[in-house]
Amino acid sequence: MPGSPRRAPGLLLQALVAMVSLALVAPFGLQPALWPMPRSVQVFPRLLYISPENFQIDNSPNSTAGPSCSLLLEAFRRYYNYIFGFYKRHHGPAKFQDKPQLEKLLVFINLEPQCDAFPSMSSDESYSLLVQEPVALLKANEVWGALRGLETFSQLVYQDAYGTFTINESTIADSPRFPHRGILIDTSRHYLPVKTIFKTLDAMAFNKFNVLHWHIVDDQSFPYQSITFPELSNKGSYSLSHVYTPNDIHMVLEYARLRGIRVIPEFDSPGHTQSWGKGQKNLLTPCFIQKIRTQKVGPVDPSLNTTYVFFDTFFKEISRVFPDQFIHLGGDEVEFECWASNPNIQNFMKKKGFGNNFRRLESFYIKKILDIITSLKKSSIVWQDVFDDQVELQPGTVVEVWKSENYLNELAQVTASGFPAILSAPWYLDLISYGQDWRNYYKAEPLNFEGSEKQKQLVIGGEACLWGEYVDATNLIPRLWPRASAVGERLWSPRIITNLENAYRRLAVHRCRMVSRGIAAQPLFTGYCNYENKMEK
């Protein structure tokens, strides 16, 4: 850790730890309200003044990431604009030349920087930040920690009543509590333009989320444009303009990478697949009534070899397109009625000795899909239904707990069985309610279940989910933010950070900060933002 910054004579304060309100640092409304709260914060009363004309963000001379690290260079430019975005250049010299100034922020990467890599579950997001005259130093082992530290530094800078940029001398040491901190978006119920996804990724970076769970297809539409099976989107999308082309996917992946965000695609099956059947013949199960075939189709047909040939080829493509180690396979809400009505399925189950136990049929199918993913050297995530239905899961399969009933008990059962878990049950943001529902999201504690320390280490994080039945590009951003910010702090900050009133004060400022950066985050309650008149800029 770097040494403590200089203290102004006679003004020495005890270090302000994370639980203490930052209102002491600056007047309310101008305070550098940190969100999410870092693991360790020391803020001192000595103010440094910043001249936008002279201030620089640059690589430290001995950093392993040099001037060729385009990820960092782009981040330096981006955060300079975030900090000084509404600044109007003065004519003439700055008025505080005789006062202590901060002239630079130097960024030092200690290990292999990973400038050209994609982030992963094991990426190191830790960093330390020392702010003192005349140069601040941001240290990180990898570029991912530097990105998180740049966000924190930007939140420390504020403007006084005269428009002067200032920052308090500070020392911060920080790292995330959980490695998986996600936002789920749904692009099947409503297509989301790529620009809207970009805006979501921006806001995620402001809140230190690191996973975009992309629920890309579902019953309603199939907007993913497959190279191998183009008819899936040609016939399954809402229209030929409501698709994500290979170039669209590439742009989203790169935009996310530059912000230290992983993109995990979800291709849910055997249920939630009605749109698949429009472009892939004989994939879905024909439904019968009294042994007469109807026009209706049900889940994927698990009895046909052609089903697994298709998925083997399809997931080979997905494994090439999406670089992340994980693919989400869904597996939720499988309806057995259509399978039960189909004579071919009945005969298949007899041959396999499944009797009338359709959970065994589901298990047979899911295991085949899991084997395909494993053969591609990828790992799987499934919804809790797969675990609840006693499907035989491979070691390391991640179970996402989404059902609100007894979700803590579910976490206990999943982890007791040795499987990693992701929690999303208390964070379904599509379930809107009047008032400050963010407080309920904030109070949800992922590890508040009875279990051993080993079990709790298997909880790798959580996700805020915004399903798309009533959400499109017109309301996605204000419905997500700042409500998802509460989840962001719960997943990043130490468990002891629980004070709601302190959180409200900081989140109100953070919400205004997001507004100033072009994120149309809805208000927490009554009040105002300094930059509201410039939202459209």
UniProtKB/Swiss-Prot annotation:
UniProt keyword Hydrolase, yes or no: yes
Enzyme Commission no: 3.2.1.52
GO annotation, biological process: astrocyte cell migration; chondroitin sulfate proteoglycan catabolic process; dermatan sulfate proteoglycan catabolic process; ganglioside catabolic process; glycosaminoglycan metabolic process; glycosphingolipid metabolic process; hyaluronan catabolic process; intracellular calcium ion homeostasis
Record-level Gene Ontology MF annotations: acetylglucosaminyltransferase activity; beta-N-acetylglucosaminidase activity; beta-N-acetylhexosaminidase activity; carbohydrate binding; hexosaminidase activity; hydrolase activity; identical protein binding; protein-containing complex binding
Pfam families to which the protein is assigned, alphabetical: Glyco_hydro_20, Glycohydro_20b2
GO cellular component: a single term: acrosomal vesicle
Cellular location(s): Lysosome; Cytoplasmic vesicle, Secretory vesicle, Cortical granule
Signal sequence segment: 1-23
Regulation: Addition of GM2A stimulates the hydrolysis of sulfated glycosphingolipid SM2 and the ganglioside GM2.
Location of the active site: E333 (proton donor)
Reaction(s) catalysed by this chain's protein: Hydrolysis of terminal non-reducing N-acetyl-D-hexosamine residues in N-acetyl-beta-D-hexosaminides; N-acetyl-beta-D-galactosaminyl-(1->4)-beta-D-3-sulfogalactosyl-(1->4)-beta-D-glucosyl-(1<->1')-ceramide + H2O = a beta-D-3-sulfogalactosyl-(1->4)-beta-D-glucosyl-(1<->1')-ceramide + N-acetyl-beta-D-galactosamine; a ganglioside GM2 (d18:1(4E)) + H2O = a ganglioside GM3 (d18:1(4E)) + N-acetyl-beta-D-galactosamine; a ganglioside GM2 + H2O = a ganglioside GM3 + N-acetyl-beta-D-galactosamine
Keywords associated with the record: Cytoplasmic vesicle, Disulfide bond, Glycoprotein, Glycosidase, Hydrolase, Lipid metabolism, Lysosome, Signal
Keyword Disulfide bond attributed: yes
Residues carrying covalently attached carbohydrate according to the record: N62, N168, N305
Disulfide bonding pattern of the chain: C69-C115, C287-C338, C512-C529
Family statement drawn from the similarity comment of this UniProt entry: Belongs to the glycosyl hydrolase 20 family.
Protein task: Hydrolyzes the non-reducing end N-acetyl-D-hexosamine and/or sulfated N-acetyl-D-hexosamine of glycoconjugates, such as the oligosaccharide moieties from proteins and neutral glycolipids, or from certain mucopolysaccharides. The isozyme B does not hydrolyze each of these substrates, however hydrolyzes efficiently neutral oligosaccharide. Only the isozyme A is responsible for the degradation of GM2 gangliosides in the presence of GM2A. During fertilization is responsible, at least in part, for the zona block to polyspermy.
Complex formation: There are 3 forms of beta-hexosaminidase: hexosaminidase A is a heterodimer composed of one subunit alpha and one subunit beta (chain A and B); hexosaminidase B is a homodimer of two beta subunits (two chains A and B); hexosaminidase S is a homodimer of two alpha subunits. The composition of the dimer (isozyme A versus isozyme S) has a significant effect on the substrate specificity of the alpha subunit active site.
Name of the protein this chain belongs to: Beta-hexosaminidase subunit beta
Species for this entry: Rattus norvegicus (Rat)
